[in-house]
A protein has these predicted regions:
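HTH-adjacent hinge/linker in prokaryotic transcriptional regulators
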Residues: 1-104, 110-122, 126, 132-137, ...
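Conserved phosphate- and dinucleotide-binding cores of soluble alpha/beta proteins
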Residues: 2-27, 32, 47, 80, ...
Length: 270
């Protein structure tokens, strides 16, 4: 059975992350699509700065840091996060400055962000910075102490650095998202950075797979009413989704089996 386009490009990126070189004919057979379809996918990924086309295939346009922060195994084991990240990237349009937070789901978002020379991305995630560093973007990394377990900048210096910028949109992950407890994180350091980001942003998009909805962690970030748009997947508890929508949050859901979103409105930033 042919693979949907949203997942097909993920597969291509998985392969190039693992092998550095891919071949059109092999991918076409593996994914049950035509070679022309694979060429179109590779063309899009090349335009976004991920690949360089070669005769009969493509090679990686990614740094060794990418292998550490975002390897093929992580992609393969997180299909819901992949789809959430890609869908969120498609929803962003017209922003000139974006805050990108800390976490594995926002790393997926960063992977699929389109390149734009007039776009500035401010992040405390070294993984996100590594993903975007070779692209046609202006990337700003917050200072501060580095947490080695997730390669992120935290602490008072990082929080102070956030306040030097003003962004159209913030894209954050969360350990927990619920109508009752809002956005929560596992540690105070990440929560502090995300609180500062929200204060300095005009619009807040939160990315969370279904397991995070209805959950709460120890460190409070913000009430649910602070969220403008939540992107999640079809595994989310319907009752919790209804409560979050009732709080005024727009919810976009992706369906992991085929990648087709329930909602399709694109965010326009004026």
């Amino acid at each position: 059975m042919a693979v949907m386009a949203v997942d097909r490009r993920h597969r291509i990126l998985e392969r190039v992350a693992a092998e550095q070189t891919i071949h059109i004919a092999e991918l076409a057979r593996e994914l049950s699509v035509s070679e022309m379809t694979i060429r179109r996918d590779i063309g899009r990924l090349e335009r976004d700065g991920f690949l360089r086309r070669t005769y009969g295939g493509a090679t990686a346009h990614i740094t060794k840091h990418l292998e550490l922060a975002f390897n093929a195994r992580a992609l393969a084991n997180a299909p819901n996060k992949r789809l959430i990240g890609m869908r969120a990237a498609e929803l962003i349009h017209g922003a000139s400055t974006i805050f990108v937070g800390i976490g594995t789901t926002v790393e997926q978002f960063a992977l699929f962000m389109p390149s734009a020379e007039d776009l500035t991305v401010v992040t405390g995630s070294l993984a996100v910075a590594s993903l975007l560093g070779s692209r046609r973007l202006h990337v700003v990394v917050l200072g501060g102490a580095v947490r080695q377990d997730e390669l992120s900048c935290v602490g008072p210096i990082a929080a102070s650095s956030v306040r030097r910028y003003r962004a159209d949109v913030a894209v954050l992950g969360a350990a927990g998202v619920s109508a009752a407890f809002g956005l929560t994180e596992l540690d105070d350091e990440t929560a502090e950075i995300h609180r500062s980001i929200i204060e300095q942003s005009g619009w807040l998009m939160v990315l969370a797979d279904g397991s995070k909805l209805g959950a709460d962690a120890s460190a409070t970030v913000a009430p649910i009413g602070s969220v403008d748009l939540l992107v999640t997947d079809a595994s989310a508890a319907p009752a919790e989704v209804d409560l979050i929508r009732a709080a005024g949050v727009e919810v976009v859901m992706v369906d992991p089996p085929d990648g087709r979103p329930v909602r399709t409105r694109r965010l326009e930033v004026s």
